[in-house]
């Protein structure tokens, strides 16, 4: 494909890379599905972990590095990738709260950060693999704190 053809669709190579990343993540890890919200969240965490271990993870690392110095890349990642993904996560968390599976007093965005943060920290800060066993362990521990508490007797 000629450079002129590429730049008719994307203003620069960073915009192309963001678009490619969004498409790769959408294919590898579609947003949490309807149905059982806790199962949807766990499935999404596992899919994100798998994507992070492959080419999408490597591309994300590169783009995050560039986003530190390029506000357009930062904005494109927020608008095209992180924003929509977070909306899907928040929707699933709200469904879990509405069903009584999660405490209603925890803000959904905070619950999402608690669930997904350890994966990104482990993969992109510590450079350690994010396995299915790790995802299950994180999910179980975080869920223990997010589940409704039994009423105390007086």
Predicted features along the sequence, with ranges:
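Helix-turn-helix
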Residues: 1-14, 19
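Tryptophan-centric aromatic hotspots in well-structured domains and transmembrane helices
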Residues: 9-10, 77, 81, 116, ...
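Short loop-to-helix capping motifs
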Residues: 12, 66-71
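Short amphipathic alpha-helical segment with a characteristic S/N-K-E followed by hydrophobic residues
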Residues: 12-17, 27-28, 41
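Hydrophobic/aromatic residues within well-ordered alpha-helical segments
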Residues: 13, 20, 24, 52-56, ...
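Hydrophobic alpha-helical connector segments
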Residues: 29-58
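C-terminal peripheral helix-coil segments that are non-catalytic and often amphipathic
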Residues: 43, 47-50, 87, 91-98, ...
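Amphipathic alpha-helical packing segments from all-alpha helical-bundle domains
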Residues: 53-62, 72-98, 108-109
